[in-house]
Amino acid sequence: MVEINCFRLMSTDTTVTNETDNFPLVDDESQGSSIDTGGRIPRPAQPLPRDESDDQEEKARLISQVLELQNTLDDLSQRVDSVKEESLKLRSENQVLGQYIQNLMASSAVFQPAQSKAPQTK
């Protein structure tokens, strides 16, 4: 019984292969087109029409996303401005502290260049 089923399946496959050999290919110029268009030029495929509600929902979603991104950009811009101001303030304070340290070092005897002292004779 199993052998008969396999034989039937094999014979069906060879028949299908033989039938597909008879179909004209696009590149075959010798055979004419077997598709009857009724004298009309077929139109290219068009996308399926979408529901108006789907379009409105998509538009509303995109608008809310754009507004959210604009708000985020606004927040980031304000943050950049405040960080710039903080940076300028810290840079100015660093300059003041640097000058203060230089003044302290100049007035302290510890940081003065060592002067060679001649031995005192009595």
From Swiss-Prot:
Pfam families reported for this sequence: DUF2205
InterPro entries: SCOC
Compartmental location: Golgi apparatus membrane; Golgi apparatus, trans-Golgi network; Cytoplasm, Cytosol
Coiled coil (residue ranges): 53-95
Key words, A-Z: Coiled coil, Cytoplasm, Golgi apparatus, Membrane
Region listing for Disordered, in residue ranges: 17-58
Record membrane topology: Peripheral membrane protein
Cellular component GO terms held in the UniProt record: cytosol; Golgi membrane; trans-Golgi network
Keyword match Membrane: yes
Function text: Positive regulator of amino acid starvation-induced autophagy.
Family: Belongs to the SCOC family.
Protein name in UniProt: Short coiled-coil protein homolog
Native source species: Brugia malayi
